[in-house]
């Protein structure tokens, strides 16, 4: 079955027909064909995509990406620990909110949604507060589309011997990185993002030695990261609780298609081409980006809403959907915006078609 429209969102996103077709078969969760030949292969492939170093392991977790963020924060910090969170968007704020719900000691550095983290403030905070044990940041903050300075963040954190937690939900698989070279302890991402699978589970790629120190720290039964890893390690990929089999099989197919595309580097280049073509085309139609180009990621871009009193996002959305494209509302608290993603099964020719569609559905007076 073909899609009626293209999802220009940061995930869930448009998937290939072959990824969707992979879900048409049922699987038994205790069968070796599923656990050894699919789950274990996925775990191995993900680690190899993340780093060339051998001291990392992978845990798959049922649920949304946020569930795995909560599993990580709730499983790796002991009662005497303290978390520092960088919050320059909704997803950084969500990590701080998770820490609050878990009654964790937490300090938040919040430079604002359109501002990059203040690295000098991060350095001084770590220097002046020795109680901080863990630091967390979102790599690609899809609230705005900003790409945060991952290398500098990791360098500063490790200079102070802190455990690093990176939400790479919307970057892993679409932006090249080696988490071993960056010395990241825990990196979290999701099936329905740049690997181009479907929703249903997320995953954590962790330094095995650091993860092994987390036994008994979890504040939740189902979100116990260590227990999930231990079960998979000792039982050839078996999940502790019901595995989302169809989603997992689709993800396996998505990984094969990433390899066929040429790997993360080639996919990143496609995303970059998509994003640059998108921004150029939108500016030609009179739209303005929220962020300067230097801060953009190749994942999703925020645009200011037109100033015309005739403009209404919902109407714009409905007209574009009828033309075959679905976009995203804004999430910035202090600016009226909307967002357009360019990841997933999206190619430069799709962006060309989008520009034609937007030009055709503009019903408001465009400012000169």
Swiss-Prot record:
Q: Which cysteines are joined by disulfide bonds?
A: none
Per UniProt, what is the name of the gene that codes for the protein in this document?
phnW
Return the protein name.
2-aminoethylphosphonate--pyruvate transaminase
Task: Provide the E.C. number(s) assigned to this enzyme.
Answer: 2.6.1.37
Species of origin? Psychromonas ingrahamii (strain DSM 17664 / CCUG 51855 / 37)
Answer whether the UniProt record assigns the keyword Transferase to this protein.
yes
What protein family does this chain belong to?
Answer: Belongs to the class-V pyridoxal-phosphate-dependent aminotransferase family. PhnW subfamily.
Name the UniProt key words of this record, in alphabetical order.
Aminotransferase, Pyridoxal phosphate, Pyruvate, Transferase
Q: Which residues carry this modification: N6-(pyridoxal phosphate)lysine?
A: 193
Subunit-structure text: Homodimer.
Reactions accelerated catalytically: (2-aminoethyl)phosphonate + pyruvate = phosphonoacetaldehyde + L-alanine
Q: What does this protein do?
A: Involved in phosphonate degradation.
- Database matches in NCBIfam families: PhnW-AepZ (TIGR03301), PRK13479.1 (NF010006), transamin_PhnW (TIGR02326)
GO biological process: what's one of them? organic phosphonate catabolic process
| Swiss-Prot/TrEMBL cofactor(s) | pyridoxal 5'-phosphate
Q: Which GO terms describe its molecular function?
A: 2-aminoethylphosphonate-pyruvate transaminase activity
């Amino acid at each position: 079955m073909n899609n009626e429209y293209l999802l220009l969102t940061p995930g869930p996103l448009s998937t290939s027909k072959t990824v969707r077709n992979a879900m048409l078969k049922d699987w038994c969760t205790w069968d070796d064909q599923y656990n050894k030949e699919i789950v274990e292969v996925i775990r191995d492939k993900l680690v190899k995509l993340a780093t060339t170093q051998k001291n990392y392991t992978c845990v798959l977790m049922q649920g949304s990406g946020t569930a795995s963020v909560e599993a990580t924060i709730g499983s790796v910090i002991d009662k005497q620990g303290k978390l520092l969170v960088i919050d320059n968007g909704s997803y950084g704020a969500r990590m701080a909110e998770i820490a609050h719900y878990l009654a964790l000691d937490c300090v938040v550095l919040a430079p604002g949604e359109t501002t990059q983290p203040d690295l000098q403030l991060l350095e001084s905070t770590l220097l002046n507060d020795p109680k901080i044990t863990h630091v967390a940041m979102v790599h690609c903050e899809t609230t705005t589309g900003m790409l945060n300075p991952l290398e500098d963040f990791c360098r500063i954190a490790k200079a102070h011997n802190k455990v690093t937690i990176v939400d790479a939900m919307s970057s892993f698989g679409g932006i090249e990185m080696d988490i071993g070279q960056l010395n990241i302890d825990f990196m979290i991402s999701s099936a329905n993002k740049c690997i181009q699978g479907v929703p249903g589970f997320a995953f954590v790629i962790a330094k095995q030695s650091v993860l092994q120190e987390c036994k008994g720290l979890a504040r939740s039964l189902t979100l116990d990261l260590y227990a999930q890893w231990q079960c998979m390690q000792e039982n050839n990929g078996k999940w502790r609780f019901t595995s989302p089999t169809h989603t997992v099989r689709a993800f396996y197919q998505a990984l094969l298609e990433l390899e066929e595309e040429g790997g993360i580097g080639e996919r990143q280049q496609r995303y970059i081409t998509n994003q640059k073509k998108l921004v150029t085309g939108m500016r030609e139609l009179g739209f303005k980006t929220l962020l300067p180009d230097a801060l953009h990621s190749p994942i999703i871009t925020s645009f200011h809403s037109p100033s015309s009193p005739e403009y209404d996002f919902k109407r714009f959305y409905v007209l574009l959907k009828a033309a075959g494209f679905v976009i995203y509302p804004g999430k910035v608290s202090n600016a009226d915006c909307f967002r357009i993603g360019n990841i997933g099964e999206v190619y430069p020719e799709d962006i060309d078609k989008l520009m034609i569609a937007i030009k055709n559905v503009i019903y408001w007076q465009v400012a000169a």
